[in-house]
Amino acid sequence: MPYPLRFTQGQKFTLRADYEKYAQTVRQMFNNGELAAFRTEIEILLGDSDIRVMSYADTPGGISRIVAARRDQRGCLAKQHETKDSVTIYRLPSAYDIGPAIAGALAFGPPGAVSRAVFPGVTRPLTPETGMDFPEQITIRDDAEYETFPRLDAQIRQAGTIQSHWQPARKWGRHADKETLAWIDTSKGAYILSRDFFTVSPMSKKGLEDRINQLISEDVISIRAHRS
């Protein structure tokens, strides 16, 4: 299963014979049954992709697990249902829609009102000058200059991470060597963390989509360099 999709309900079969019988049924559905129409999408999602985008979020309704992938001009998305081991697969209009599809599949509140802030316990403690106590105004170094940002005090309602990757997965889970996009939805609006995790800024659907597309664009550059 591609990260973050996973089995959550334990073993469905106690006897190996029952498992093998079910596996044969799935193969038949995949080859010439109701799954045949999505054979290409399933192959792309299971590893035969150029780029895949993985979204994991802890939401009030449960864990949100979404993965989108593209190959050549095709794009698809798989969304796992929170309370059971079933996945809905969507065929996207094109390979270039995986970023918008991930952003559109996530539900969160309106953008926060603070243009840029630090969030104790979420953003990284930053400088020796500020220490670890997070005063009301926090001064951090930004582009060789020191700037002061307000502290955001709010209740976190949900939080999520998104990664893009172009290389085959060696193991299940996030990739430590890849950039992680992180976001939070709070009682004072939705925020996205800066790439260095030092601050948060308001997050809209379009803003999230743009950040995802940025991750994808960097993978496209890596693919071209690898193939040249």
State each model region's role:
Residues M1-S228:
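Short, surface-exposed polybasic-aromatic patches that bind anionic ligands, especially phosphate groups
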